């Protein structure tokens, strides 16, 4: 019986099985940022320990960085202190730090791949929920907490429970105006926000194989929103072509050896899976969330669910809670719901291909007068490339604010926040209560092109209609 990529990579990195039943796993790459890492360095300092393998740890700034004015010192003294603490710790411990002057700063899950740090067959850890993004390369990547960040810094290992593996097979051709974001929202909608608990998700099938690396990253990024700690795609020629020539990618003879390893860790044709889910891509439409979890999603042409339409009382309660918070009426179309803010960016959809796709759609259009629209590149490299192509001008001419790189409005850890009851059409990954800064602010998740359509119309709209897709 063959093995899945997950099992191959796990077995190659397993140090030993602990008395608890967990496995001690060697971590090939450790990515850190300013929010969950300074405290871990402090724990190390208190214990009199040093970073075990500083050459395998890389730091950046993303969560708290202002995207309108990055001049230091930041107005937020707490944020300024966190940046200083991380910089000091990295200097003391010999850890590479991509700060605002490095030219390489950006969201951790965007700079890892673009620098070639993220590689197939690796185990990757980061103190951030969306570390599963790196699984797009055929890596086993997972988010960890601050104490686990400490453990990786001190030992380059983690104690983890082995997961089951679910194969999600997506076949068929996507319709016009349908993107990777729509697929992952549909997967979460079908399987639920807890459906992946205890599983690693392996994404495959002709649809996924036809995706670019950036589309695969969008898909893997939101695995955790469906309860799966790990999500990955088997590496292939698309992966290798993306990686070749990246700053930290292997070179020369090392490249050829790496290719041999990378090819070997792909799932065997006769690999055994604990579960298989099959999805027809042609049936997926542009998808938006209507509630307060990513699983509360519908096609843009559907009506918002009504509590009375379900028989399960707990489901009814969840619907009522979501409708009350979102100020929506069950049984009414989601299309036409007024928005106040539009946000394109985040580790889900803040890459060059995202901005290219939106730019080609919004030319000749203008953001509605009452909408505040932000376009936030995910890294300095993305910003440079987009600006070299003139994409920033397209966004500005359409009425978007073109910002500096950072996590921005994905979460409430920087100045980019919702105010009051504002509703945001967002290309990010979470629509929890208060996620974007205001305790009554509302978030509707969708693809970047759908965000652009909402920005232009001033309300949730079908991008296929707005842009004639």
UniProtKB/Swiss-Prot annotation:
<dbReference type="Pfam" id="PF00330">
    <property type="entry name" value="Aconitase"/>
</dbReference>
<protein>
    <recommendedName>
        <fullName>3-isopropylmalate dehydratase large subunit</fullName>
        <ecNumber>4.2.1.33</ecNumber>
    </recommendedName>
</protein>
<comment type="similarity">
    <text>Belongs to the aconitase/IPM isomerase family. LeuC type 1 subfamily.</text>
</comment>
<dbReference type="InterPro" id="IPR004430">
    <property type="entry name" value="3-IsopropMal_deHydase_lsu"/>
</dbReference>
<comment type="subunit">
    <text>Heterodimer of LeuC and LeuD.</text>
</comment>
<dbReference type="InterPro" id="IPR036008">
    <property type="entry name" value="Aconitase_4Fe-4S_dom"/>
</dbReference>
<keyword id="KW-0432">Leucine biosynthesis</keyword>
<comment type="function">
    <text>Catalyzes the isomerization between 2-isopropylmalate and 3-isopropylmalate, via the formation of 2-isopropylmaleate.</text>
</comment>
<dbReference type="GO" id="GO:0051539">
    <property type="term" value="F:4 iron, 4 sulfur cluster binding"/>
</dbReference>
<comment type="pathway">
    <text>Amino-acid biosynthesis; L-leucine biosynthesis; L-leucine from 3-methyl-2-oxobutanoate: step 2/4.</text>
</comment>
<feature type="binding site">
    <location>
        <position position="347"/>
    </location>
    <ligand>
        <name>[4Fe-4S] cluster</name>
    </ligand>
</feature>
<dbReference type="InterPro" id="IPR015931">
    <property type="entry name" value="Acnase/IPM_dHydase_lsu_aba_1/3"/>
</dbReference>
<keyword id="KW-0456">Lyase</keyword>
<dbReference type="GO" id="GO:0009098">
    <property type="term" value="P:L-leucine biosynthetic process"/>
</dbReference>
<feature type="binding site">
    <location>
        <position position="410"/>
    </location>
    <ligand>
        <name>[4Fe-4S] cluster</name>
    </ligand>
</feature>
<keyword id="KW-0479">Metal-binding</keyword>
<dbReference type="InterPro" id="IPR018136">
    <property type="entry name" value="Aconitase_4Fe-4S_BS"/>
</dbReference>
<keyword id="KW-0408">Iron</keyword>
<keyword id="KW-0411">Iron-sulfur</keyword>
<dbReference type="InterPro" id="IPR050067">
    <property type="entry name" value="IPM_dehydratase_rel_enz"/>
</dbReference>
<dbReference type="InterPro" id="IPR033941">
    <property type="entry name" value="IPMI_cat"/>
</dbReference>
<feature type="binding site">
    <location>
        <position position="407"/>
    </location>
    <ligand>
        <name>[4Fe-4S] cluster</name>
    </ligand>
</feature>
<dbReference type="GO" id="GO:0046872">
    <property type="term" value="F:metal ion binding"/>
</dbReference>
<keyword id="KW-0004">4Fe-4S</keyword>
<keyword id="KW-0028">Amino-acid biosynthesis</keyword>
<dbReference type="InterPro" id="IPR001030">
    <property type="entry name" value="Acoase/IPM_deHydtase_lsu_aba"/>
</dbReference>
<keyword id="KW-0100">Branched-chain amino acid biosynthesis</keyword>
<dbReference type="GO" id="GO:0003861">
    <property type="term" value="F:3-isopropylmalate dehydratase activity"/>
</dbReference>
């Amino acid at each position: 019986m063959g093995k899945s990529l997950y099992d191959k990579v796990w077995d190659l990195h397993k140090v030993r099985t602990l008395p608890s039943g967990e496995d001690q796993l060697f971590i090939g790459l450790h990515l850190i940022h300013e929010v969950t890492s300074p405290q871990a360095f402090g724990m190390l300092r208190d214990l009199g320990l040093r970073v075990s393998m500083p050459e395998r740890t890389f730091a950046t700034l993303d969560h708290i960085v202002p995207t309108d004015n990055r001049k230091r010192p930041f107005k937020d003294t707490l944020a300024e202190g966190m940046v200083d603490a991380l910089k000091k710790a990295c200097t003391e411990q010999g850890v590479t730090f991509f700060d605002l002057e490095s030219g390489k700063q950006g969201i951790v899950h965007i700079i890892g791949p673009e620098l070639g740090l993220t590689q197939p067959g690796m185990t990757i850890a980061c103190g951030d929920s969306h570390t599963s993004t790196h699984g797009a390369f055929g890596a086993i990547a997972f988010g960890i907490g601050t104490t686990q960040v400490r453990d990786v810094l001190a030992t380059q290992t983690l104690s983890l429970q082995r997961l089951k593996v679910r194969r999600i097979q997506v076949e068929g051709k996507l319709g016009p105006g349908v993107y990777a974001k729509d697929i992952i929202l549909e997967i979460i909608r079908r399987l639920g926000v807890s459906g992946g608990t205890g599983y690693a998700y392996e994404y495959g099938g002709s649809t996924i194989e036809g995706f670019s690396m950036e589309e695969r990253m969008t898909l893997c990024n939101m695995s955790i929103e469906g309860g799966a700690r790990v999500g990955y795609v088997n590496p292939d020629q698309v992966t290798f072509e993306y990686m070749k020539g990246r700053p930290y990618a292997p070179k020369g003879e090392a490249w050829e050896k790496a290719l041999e390893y990378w090819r070997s860790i792909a799932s065997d044709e006769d690999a055994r899976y604990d579960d298989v889910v099959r999805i027809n891509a042609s049936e997926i439409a542009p998808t938006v969330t209507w509630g307060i979890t990513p699983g509360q999603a519908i096609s843009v042409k559907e009506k918002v669910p009504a509590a009375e339409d379900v028989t399960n009382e707990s489901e009814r309660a969840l619907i009522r809670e979501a409708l009350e918070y979102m100020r929506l009426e069950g049984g009414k179309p989601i299309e036409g719901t007024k928005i106040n803010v539009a946000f394109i960016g985040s580790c889900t959809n803040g890459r060059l291909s995202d901005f290219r796709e939106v730019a080609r759609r919004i030319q000749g259009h203008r953001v509605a007068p009452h909408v505040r629209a932000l376009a936030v590149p995910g890294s300095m490299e993305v910003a440079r490339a987009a600006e070299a192509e003139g994409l920033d001008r397209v966004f500005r001419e359409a009425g978007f604010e073109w910002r500096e790189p950072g996590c921005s409005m994905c979460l409430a850890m920087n100045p980019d926040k919702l105010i009051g009851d504002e509703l945001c059409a967002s290309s990010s990954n979470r629509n929890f209560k208060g996620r974007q800064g205001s305790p009554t602010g509302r978030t509707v998740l969708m693809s970047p092109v759908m965000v652009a359509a909402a920005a232009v119309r001033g309300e949730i709209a079908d991008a296929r209609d707005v842009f004639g897709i």
